[in-house]
Design a protein with these regions (language model features):
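N-terminal maturation segment of proteins
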Residues: 1-423
């Protein structure tokens, strides 16, 4: 609802959407308490947080939209307000169910199990791996990345350990209240790099805005999310949004300090290309313009997230990162994606517990516990999605080498990217 009423659609289209969709939300909330028959503790905690913070959409955002839309009829306005009021009531009932009833049901786990996981690898992702070979590959690549990090750390300062250097790097961050501006600066710089070096053709009038993430979503990811353009906006642009969790005044000192070291210059500079230029923003524009309805309306993490991580590597290869410290941070972020392969297959096939996965992220990758929890939570609810980053990147790099051999002297990296994005 929030994305639609704040998106590029016309006022009339948004009204039609609300009238059609609000009754569905009401029905979903009524059905939810009947469908939830098992208690998964962490899911309950997260669901309760989101339910408690979702009422602002119907209390504030919908009303604000109606005030801004002069074309809405009185009947439609009253209908939308009535549905919103009913949804708020249903949210209260559902919130009470989550808080007081669901914990009394039989406790369960989120793992899909070894057999189902292997079927997913074979039939959904069309991969040759099974849970055992994927687990082995994940650890091999994890250890290889660790070795590269140690080698680079010695070049930077041989008197310090890799961990000590990374702590220093993560303590270099923007002014807390200028996080949006800092992210926007490096988004714009990544766009300039892609265009000036002719790495990927971008034939559309487009832009990316960095904005604060909606409050009700801030506990679902420690960082934020990318919201691709849904079409041409009122100014004639395909405008995407990179939504980040902002720095909050009400936090205690510990929370503020932890937030800042997870929003350092390194992570901003490396993640901007992944999310925007030439990552998700550009890939989404090509997908939107694909003549195949199947390709236009469907995707898979092996390509979309693999493409994002590939762009982090592409920026390393083409000299975007300003110094060796940022390059070390890039390797640490790659290690994070290596770990995603390990904990995804590990948790869902029974090789790792939830706490084992948290420990992998905190002890080996360097995450703070709260950030690791949000990370693992996302994987637990979307089995297989997070392996797409590293596995997808490795497949794209293999294709690039094959394409280079085929084209020989006629090889063009821009042409390769364009052909791949247009498939």
């Amino acid at each position: 609802v929030s994305s639609n009423i704040n998106g590029p659609k016309t006022c009339e289209e948004k009204i039609i959407f609300l009238i059609e969709y609000l009754p569905i939300i009401k029905n979903d909330l009524q059905s939810g308490s009947k469908q939830l028959v098992e208690y998964v503790p962490r899911f309950q905690e997260l669901g309760l947080y989101m339910a408690k913070n979702s009422s602002v959409i119907f209390n504030v955002e919908v009303k604000k939209f109606l005030e801004s839309c002069n074309l809405v009829s009185e009947d439609n306005r009253n209908q939308i307000l009535s549905f919103s009021s009913q949804i708020i009531d249903e949210l209260k009932v559902f919130t009470n169910f989550l808080e007081n009833v669901l914990p009394s049901k039989a406790e369960s786990t989120f793992a899909i199990g070894k057999e189902t996981y292997n079927k997913m690898l074979k039939n959904q992702f069309l991969l040759d791996y099974n849970d055992e070979t994927l687990w082995e590959f994940g650890w091999e690549e994890f250890n290889r990345t660790v070795a590269k990090m140690d080698e680079l750390a010695k070049e930077i300062d041989s008197s310090k350990t890799t961990k000590e250097l990374l702590v220093e790097i993560k303590n270099e961050y923007p002014e807390p209240y200028k996080m949006i501006e800092a992210h926007q600066y490096w988004v714009d710089k990544s766009g300039e790099h892609i265009k000036n070096n002719k790495l990927i053709p971008i034939p559309w009038k487009e832009r990316v805005h960095v904005v604060a993430r909606e409050e009700y979503l801030r506990k679902t990811s420690y960082y934020g999310n990318f919201s691709r353009s849904l079409g041409v906006d009122d100014e004639g642009y395909f405008t995407s949004q990179w939504k980040i969790n902002p720095f909050e005044d009400y936090w205690d000192k510990k929370t503020k300090d932890e937030y800042l070291v997870e929003h350092d210059w390194g992570v901003i500079i490396v993640t901007a290309p992944h999310e925007t230029y030439g990552g998700h923003h550009i890939q989404a524009l090509y997908q939107m313009h694909n003549p195949s309805e199947l390709r236009k309306n469907n995707g898979i993490s092996l390509f979309s997230e693999g493409w994002g991580l590939y762009n982090e590597q592409l920026m390393l290869e083409t000299g975007f990162y300003p110094d060796k410290k940022i390059k070390l941070r890039q390797l640490q972020l790659r290690l994070w994606r290596n770990a995603r392969v390990i904990y995804d297959v590990g948790m869902h096939s029974g090789k790792l517990s939830y706490e084992d996965a948290i420990s992998l992220m905190t002890d080996r990758v360097g995450f703070l516990r709260w950030a690791a929890q949000l990370e693992i939570d996302s994987s637990s609810s979307r089995p297989g999605y997070f392996i797409g980053y590293f596995i997808g990147m490795t497949e794209i790099l293999k294709m690039r080498e094959e394409y280079k051999k085929i084209k020989g002297d006629q090889y063009s990296i821009s042409e390769f990217h364009e052909k791949l994005l247009k498939v």
